[in-house]
């Protein structure tokens, strides 16, 4: 008896040549339904329609086509089970040897912001049922859920009967496929109706296997959503991205996004930002009226740490900027756009990774962030709310000057992306010193202030958390700091305020903390 293949696909990529090969080279009969049957018939592929096979018409606007004992009995029957084979004969069923199914494009529809009713109609029922039936009975039935599997299947049946390992692998991929599909539906309803799931379910397709993780002895894989974020970034040149590159690129981009992000070169003057990042911490940042001047100012903060670092811009990178960058050893440069002349200059640094990530490639909604822990995972909202100044209060007798206020805003945005305890010293819209990841705030302050004094005197100071004591203010005064910005909220806030007043320092409370671990 000829093998029977059940074919029902939404993604019709390569389905015609695949089915022709099955029929002409391997003697398969094709069983199909709905649009797939019509599509194959038009291509002159002989097809038996499901409605004729089951002797039951499609009903309920096509909602019920393949949900029938003649379909699922033919898939689920175990060939080695005598009772199953007796029932197959008794009920005049035919065994189905291959199931080729992919599902309604639910993800694509909801990404297009379609109405609720249209999204519901794109929830596939019959497709997942056939896939799961075939995957369960994978000892006897092969199941294909992706056009990329077709050629491999042809190569395998050329060799003879399919191996147990091959069919098990197909079943594994099938269950992955249906699990991903169900998670997409669940997560969409959760977001649409603001429902908090009792189980965390998320599905990310494999992007690629990385050479290694943070260290060479650690294996690493990259999973992600298609056509968004780093998965959609265009790598214009350079070596393959590493695990550490991706982490640092993410941190650098999140920092530079604080100042806007424009694909076109005509971003407003005085708001072109450059951020240099190393080991997930900014080591220099600046905003000015050009990418080149912003980078040069950012580099002044810590040129030693910038060696082998990551640079992110929020605007076009031109020839002048590229000429400066090429003389420094950097791992990656990311920006929304690059001049042709800049890219030609970068070609002289063949190992430099240059990435173009346009504004359109960025996520359009607030995301969550997560951290693995033993036996679980922690999930929280991303700390990416706009820095509203409505809650800011000047708590000292002296108010910041106009320039100090601009510098405080700048330093506060950078401080948010520095590992806690974090202190940033800034002046004239550029960082002078950054104290990152210290176990006490005074220690972070000493690092930032000592670094700053090597570049310029004075400036403003930002802290990601409140001052538990007045010692940070006392230290800041010794280094000529004229204004401070911090969340406030300590039971000893008054001590810090009095210390500021006695030293002629202005201070703002933001009433928002930005710890980062």
Swiss-Prot record:
PROSITE patterns: MGS. GO terms for cellular component: cytosol. Its EC number is 2.1.2.3, 3.5.4.10. The keyword Repeat does not apply. Pathway: Purine metabolism; IMP biosynthesis via de novo pathway; 5-formamido-1-(5-phospho-D-ribosyl)imidazole-4-carboxamide from 5-amino-1-(5-phospho-D-ribosyl)imidazole-4-carboxamide (10-formyl THF route): step 1/1; Purine metabolism; IMP biosynthesis via de novo pathway; IMP from 5-formamido-1-(5-phospho-D-ribosyl)imidazole-4-carboxamide: step 1/1. Disulfide bonds: none annotated. Residues 1-145 form the MGS-like domain. Keywords: Hydrolase, Multifunctional enzyme, Purine biosynthesis, Transferase. It catalyses: (6R)-10-formyltetrahydrofolate + 5-amino-1-(5-phospho-beta-D-ribosyl)imidazole-4-carboxamide = 5-formamido-1-(5-phospho-D-ribosyl)imidazole-4-carboxamide + (6S)-5,6,7,8-tetrahydrofolate; IMP + H2O = 5-formamido-1-(5-phospho-D-ribosyl)imidazole-4-carboxamide. The keyword Hydrolase applies. InterPro entries: AICAR_Tfase_dup_dom_sf, Cytidine_deaminase-like, MGS-like_dom, MGS-like_dom_sf, PurH-like. GO terms for biological process: 'de novo' IMP biosynthetic process. GO terms for molecular function: IMP cyclohydrolase activity; phosphoribosylaminoimidazolecarboxamide formyltransferase activity. It comes from the Bacteria. Belongs to the PurH family. HAMAP family: PurH. The IMP cyclohydrolase activity resides in the N-terminal region. This is Bifunctional purine biosynthesis protein PurH. The gene is purH.
């Amino acid at each position: 008896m000829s093998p029977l293949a059940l074919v029902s696909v939404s993604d019709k990529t390569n389905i015609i040549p695949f089915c022709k090969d099955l029929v002409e080279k391997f003697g398969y009969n094709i069983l199909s339904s709905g649009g797939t049957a019509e599509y194959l018939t038009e291509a002159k592929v002989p097809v038996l329609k499901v409605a004729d096979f089951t002797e039951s018409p499609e009903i309920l606007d096509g909602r019920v086509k393949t949900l029938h004992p003649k379909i699922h009995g033919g898939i689920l029957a175990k060939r080695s089970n005598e009772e199953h084979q007796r029932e197959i004969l008794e009920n005049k069923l035919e065994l189905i040897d291959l199931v080729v199914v992919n599902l309604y494009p639910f993800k694509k529809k909801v990404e297009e912001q379609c109405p609720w009713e249209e999204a519901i109609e794109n929830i596939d029922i019959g497709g997942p049922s056939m896939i799961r039936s075939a995957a369960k009975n994978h000892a006897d039935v092969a199941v294909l859920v992706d056009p990329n599997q077709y050629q491999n299947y042809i190569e395998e049946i050329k060799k003879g009967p399919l191996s147990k390992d091959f069919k098990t692998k197909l079943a594994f991929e099938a269950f992955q496929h249906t699990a991903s599909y169900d998670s997409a539906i669940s997560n969409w309803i959760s977001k649409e109706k603001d429902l908090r799931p009792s189980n965390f379910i998320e599905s990310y397709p494999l992007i690629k296997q990385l050479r290694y993780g943070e260290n060479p002895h650690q294996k690493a894989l990259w999973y992600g959503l298609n056509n968004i974020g780093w998965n959609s970034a265009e790598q214009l040149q350079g070596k393959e991205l590493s695990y550490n590159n991706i982490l640092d690129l993410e941190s650098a981009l999140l920092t530079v996004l604080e100042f806007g992000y424009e694909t076109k070169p005509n971003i407003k003057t005085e708001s072109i930002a450059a951020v240099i990042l190393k080991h997930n911490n900014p080591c220099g940042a600046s905003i000015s009226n050009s990418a080149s001047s912003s980078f040069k100012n950012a580099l002044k903060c810590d040129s030693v740490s910038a060696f082998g670092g990551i640079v992110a811009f929020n605007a076009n990178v031109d020839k002048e900027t590229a000429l400066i960058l090429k003389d420094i050893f950097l791992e990656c440069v990311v920006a929304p756009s690059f001049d042709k002349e800049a890219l030609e200059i970068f070609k002289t640094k063949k190992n430099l990774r240059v990435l173009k990530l346009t504004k359109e490639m960025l996520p359009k909604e607030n995301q969550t962030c997560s951290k693995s822990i033993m036996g679980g995972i922690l999930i929280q909202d991303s700390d990416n709310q706009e820095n509203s100044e409505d809650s800011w209060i000047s708590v000292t007798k002296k108010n910041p000057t106009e320039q100090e206020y601009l510098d405080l805003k700048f330093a506060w945005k950078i401080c948010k992306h520095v590992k806690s305890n974090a202190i940033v010293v800034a002046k004239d819209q550029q960082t002078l010193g950054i104290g990152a990841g210290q176990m006490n705030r005074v220690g972070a302050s000493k690092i930032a202030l000592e670094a700053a004094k090597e570049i310029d005197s004075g400036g403003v100071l930002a802290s990601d958390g409140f001052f538990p004591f007045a010692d940070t203010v006392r230290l800041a005064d010794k280094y000529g700091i004229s204004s401070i910005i911090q969340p406030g909220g300590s039971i000893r806030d008054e001590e810090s305020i009095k210390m500021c007043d006695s030293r002629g320092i202005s201070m703002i409370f933001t009433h928002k903390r930005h710890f980062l671990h």
